């Protein structure tokens, strides 16, 4: 876990990590949220909707923004204030995602950083685009 302070974070600073979406993660997310939409766990339904496989929950992919802020950038000293997320392409169970955050702005007065987030799949396709405003505790 990183412990960057506000003064250690410059515009352009980047951090990234990689995860693979497993069936177990999908099932835990479904149990946690109660979202039983068949697109996520009924292959015949997913195929009828034009997908080759069951679609992973979009918010499961988006939940990795919390990991990005809380573990990597800035890490321990973070408190997310605002998020924006755009889902660009479906994510499927078995996909390997690379989550990258880059600092695009700093607010010295309020000790806030703005982080642009891109999530790409194993084919390099951008599946999620987002932005976070994060307070950095001292």
What spans do the regions from the language model cover?
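HotDog/MaoC-like acyl-thioester-processing domains
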Residues: 1-14, 92-138
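Hot-dog-fold acyl-thioester-processing enzymes
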Residues: 1-78
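Proline-rich low-complexity regions
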Residues: 38, 74, 90, 136-137
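Charge-rich, low-complexity amphipathic helices
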Residues: 51-55, 68, 86-87, 91, ...
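Mid-chain, well-packed structural core segment of small domains
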Residues: 71-95, 99
């Amino acid at each position: 876990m990183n412990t960057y302070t506000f003064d250690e974070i410059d515009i352009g600073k980047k951090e990234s990590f990689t995860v693979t979406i497993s069936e177990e993660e999908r099932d835990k997310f479904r149990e946690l949220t109660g979202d039983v939409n068949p697109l996520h766990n009924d292959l015949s339904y997913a195929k009828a909707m034009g997908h080759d496989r069951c679609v992973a929950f979009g918010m499961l992919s988006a939940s990795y923004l919390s990991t990005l802020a809380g573990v990597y950038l800035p890490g321990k000293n973070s408190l997310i204030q605002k998020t924006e997320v755009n889902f660009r392409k479906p994510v499927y169970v078995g996909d390997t995602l690379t989550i990258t955050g880059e600092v695009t702005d700093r607010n010295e007065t309020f000790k806030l950083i703005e982080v642009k987030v891109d999530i790409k799949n194993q084919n390099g396709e951008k599946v999620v685009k987002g932005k976070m405003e994060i307070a950095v505790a001292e």
